[in-house]
Design a protein with these regions (language model features):
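Catalytic domains of riboflavin
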Residues: 1-163
């Protein structure tokens, strides 16, 4: 209820972002006003509320994303950059689970941790999407799970694309 009706995610900064995987992105940094966690969105060419954009909702995983540890999930971030570059627009929303201060503990518990987004995190991601002006998404995901939590935020999944 609070995630739907109370705005708890606020943009705190933004800057241009370019990498080997894509140019002309803007890195937007958001803060959860309750937990103080920082979340990130890499955004490219979002101009119309009526257009569907490719979006990757990604829960940050220190072992996989930073240290490139081998796992069964593949390279979703790099593939998402490729899809967005080909489309010419889109966003990668990076949901932080405040894991950075506890890197060693995260390594020890990686078998127990679920790397899927939880319902609470979809609410955070939905608030970020609304802030950057996205109402219709082409969800970039290898999961077949139907995400219904976004409906309450007036965000529509128009298509799902495997990455």
């Amino acid at each position: 209820y609070r995630l739907k009706y109370n705005k708890i995610i606020n943009q705190v900064s933004e800057r241009p972002f370019e990498s080997d995987k894509g140019n002309d992105f803007v890195l937007k940094i958001f803060e959860n006003s309750i937990s103080k966690e920082k979340h990130y969105a890499l955004v490219k060419n979002i101009k119309s509320l009526n257009e569907s954009y490719p979006v990757r909702m990604h829960k940050l995983n220190i072992e996989k994303d930073i240290f490139a540890e081998k796992n069964i999930f593949g390279d979703e971030i790099n593939h998402s950059f490729d899809v967005i570059e080909k489309h010419g627009s889109g966003a990668i929303v990076l949901i932080n689970n405040d894991i950075a201060p506890n890197i060693l503990k995260a390594f020890d518990q990686r078998q127990k941790k679920n790397n899927k987004l939880e319902l609470r995190e979809y609410g955070v991601g939905a608030q970020i999407l609304k802030n950057i002006g996205i109402k219709k998404i082409i969800l970039l995901s290898n999961s077949n799970k139907k995400i219904i939590a976004l409906d309450g935020f007036d965000i529509e999944i128009t298509e799902q694309q495997k990455i």
